[in-house]
Amino acid sequence: MQTPTLGQLATENGAQVVGDPDLAITGLAPLDQAGPGELSFLSNPLYLQQALDAKAGAVIVSAADLERVRAEGKADGRNWLVARNPYVCFARVAQRFDRAANTDARTGIDARATVAPDAVVPASCYIGPNVVIEAGARLGERVRILANGYVGAHAQIGDDALLYANVSVYHHCVVGARAILHSGVVIGADGFGFAPDISASGVEYVKIPQTGRAVLGDDVEVGANTAIDRGAMADTVIEDGCKIDNQVQIAHNVRVGAHTVIAGCAAVSGSTRIGRFCVIGGAANFAGHLTIADRTTVSGGTSITKSITKPGGHFTSVFPFLPHGEWERNAAIVRGLSKLRERVVALERRLRGQAAGSQPSQD
């Protein structure tokens, strides 16, 4: 990759150079570690002091933060890349420097891979060692499937998708263009569907065949060891642009709206529909058959047990952390709230009765 100049990065990202546009940028680094020739960024005012002290070749900043630096008298003689959104600008520049994306130009099918004769694998694809691609599977252009991957019968993988080692895409499932699936991801395993057959001797759970698919849209990224189950009859759908973190469970028949992000260890029960542009915190969990409105934010660890119909809300159900002894005392109070409520209600009734009895006669 040719080393870009600060001016080139500004042009590519709609930013403005304050300083030397011909400065060669050799890499990216945090504010407190960046050296000459390296680019860093400031997107959180908590790190303003680090920006003031930084030895970076250049720093991505907002116009407002650059004025704060100037007010401290530390802007002159340094290089700045002024962007409307420094964090987004940094992300786009980082894509340019991403070694994994820019150096893996391999194509072809490794001799140790197994590809069904009728599978469609364009010459621009790379199929790594021990990959298995079953009958009728169709891959788009420039797909990369790394070691030990599995693509089931009649599954479809879109253009420019990247499947890291040990990813499994079950039969008939769909992965969209430019998707990134990290190691251990499983797309399209059976949903947790069993019909209880109750008798005098107990309960037998009869398996319900899961005949739907799991369908991922374009530009979806799924973190390591996440499972997205196939639908029971209809499909499980992850719409375009969703980003799902590690160890997330998406159950059968769930639909996740476009550009929603879900942090690690969250779990979504069957047939729940999450709207577009939602933000789901880590370890949040959702009961089944719910509807969650667009642009909803759910804090980490929150349990959602009812539908949310109003867009744009922020919901939290986690008890804040405290020193252990204080938490135990508060927990004891919480356990007694129902009895305390009964006492308050009884007291209110008694006070109302006393008030009624003390009013003067109208005779």
From Swiss-Prot:
One of its GO terms (biological process) is lipid A biosynthetic process. One of its GO terms (molecular function) is N-acyltransferase activity. The active site is at residue 252. Its EC number is 2.3.1.191. The keyword Lipid biosynthesis applies. It comes from the Bacteria. Pathway: Bacterial outer membrane biogenesis; LPS lipid A biosynthesis. It is an enzyme of class 2 (transferase). PROSITE patterns: HEXAPEP_TRANSFERASES (PS00101). It catalyses: a UDP-3-O-[(3R)-3-hydroxyacyl]-alpha-D-glucosamine + a (3R)-hydroxyacyl-[ACP] = a UDP-2-N,3-O-bis[(3R)-3-hydroxyacyl]-alpha-D-glucosamine + holo-[ACP] + H(+). Keywords: Acyltransferase, Lipid A biosynthesis, Lipid biosynthesis, Lipid metabolism, Repeat, Transferase. GO terms for cellular component: membrane. Belongs to the transferase hexapeptide repeat family. LpxD subfamily. Catalyzes the N-acylation of UDP-3-O-acylglucosamine using 3-hydroxyacyl-ACP as the acyl donor. Is involved in the biosynthesis of lipid A, a phosphorylated glycolipid that anchors the lipopolysaccharide to the outer membrane of the cell. PANTHER family: UDP-3-O-ACYLGLUCOSAMINE N-ACYLTRANSFERASE, UDP-3-O-ACYLGLUCOSAMINE N-ACYLTRANSFERASE 1, MITOCHONDRIAL-RELATED. Homotrimer. This is UDP-3-O-acylglucosamine N-acyltransferase. It comes from Cupriavidus taiwanensis (strain DSM 17343 / BCRC 17206 / CCUG 44338 / CIP 107171 / LMG 19424 / R1). The gene is lpxD.
